Amino acid sequence: QCTENGCIFSDDAVNAFVAKAKEADGYIFGTPVYYAHPSGRIQSFLDRVFYSSGKHFAHKPGASVAVARRGGTALNKYFGITQMITVGSTYWNQVHGRNAEDAAKDLEGMQTMRNLGHNMAWVLKCLEAGKEKGLVPPTADRSNQTNFIR
């Protein structure tokens, strides 16, 4: 039911997000990291978003940003399973700091964020140029799918 009609709660933030996300050209999701994983809040939210509406993200660029050092890359898994284009940078898309002032002092992390922004802009321009030339995304073969048990 969720994949056909969206989430069943009419006032659900997932439905509101998906309505806006359908119109977006690309996405950057950010999260703090706890125990080497994204926060449970964003992971639960994105589980529901991508399970109910993953088809709306196909062939669009996405990136995730983690506030930590060397952890939190699980958000990138959503991009692969929905045929998104994963945008990278010059290092893992992470910055370290307990608050905005601390993060601003992470020179390598801030450099990585700037490069991520430049790369995202470039990918979006490439996609637009492809559309102007008549290029269309490939159609996925979905003839063989394993259920959640196997």
Question: Where in this protein do the model-derived segments appear?
Answer:
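Helix-loop-strand module that forms the ligand-binding subsite of alpha/beta enzymes
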Residues: 4-93
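Glycine-rich phosphate/pyrophosphate-binding loop and the adjoining helix
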Residues: 10, 85-150
